[in-house]
């Protein structure tokens, strides 16, 4: 019975039907009906499309320029739903098209008057970082390797240019660094 119930619990949690009580230091965790734990939460306040519009506005605020594939990759939602919400935001004038993607209209107006140069930089971005998760659909196929894990993706001067592969045990054990540098 445990083998049948345990896989279903996270799915019920994602649907806001149950809540996992996580006390610090406790191994046993209780599962309770979501409505009993949070009676003030109104799960019908927003339609699915309205909720997606809110998510996409927040995503655009943090990402500045993005496309539907990035939002789908990050939120793990059906492309049809993402595109529908994006089209609604375009129609409402919240988003605007720019450089093959979308951005908040307010960001577009700010960038018209911004003339700064991006700084030269190298960042080792953890695979669970927001920028990595939203570009996962590209990065996974761009830097293949035979090692157990991709530990970090390398963001060099604002572009994805490599990955560090290996295994994370007590500390990261880097076995290989794959680079795609311009000549």
Tell where the protein language model's regions lie, with residue ranges.
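Long, charged, low-complexity, helical-prone intrinsically disordered regions
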Residues: 1-183
């Amino acid at each position: 019975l445990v083998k049948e119930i345990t896989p279903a619990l996270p799915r019920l949690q994602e649907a806001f039907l149950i809540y996992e009580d996580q006390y610090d230091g406790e191994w046993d965790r209780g599962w309770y009906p979501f409505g009993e734990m949070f009676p003030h939460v109104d799960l019908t306040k927003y339609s699915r499309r309205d909720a997606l519009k809110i998510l996409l506005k927040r995503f655009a605020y943090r990402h500045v320029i993005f496309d539907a594939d990035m939002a789908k990759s990050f939120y793990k939602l059906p492309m049809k739903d993402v595109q529908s919400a994006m089209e609604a935001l375009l129609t409402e004038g919240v988003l605007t098209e720019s450089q093959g993607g979308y951005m908040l209209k307010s960001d577009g107006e700010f960038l018209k008057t911004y003339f700064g140069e991006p700084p030269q930089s190298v960042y080792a971005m953890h695979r669970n970082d927001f920028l990595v998760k939203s570009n996962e659909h590209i990065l996974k196929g761009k830097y293949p390797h035979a090692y157990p894990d991709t530990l970090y993706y390398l963001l060099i001067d604002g572009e994805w240019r490599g990955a560090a592969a290996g295994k994370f045990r007590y500390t990261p054990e880097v076995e290989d660094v794959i680079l795609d540098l311009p000549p």
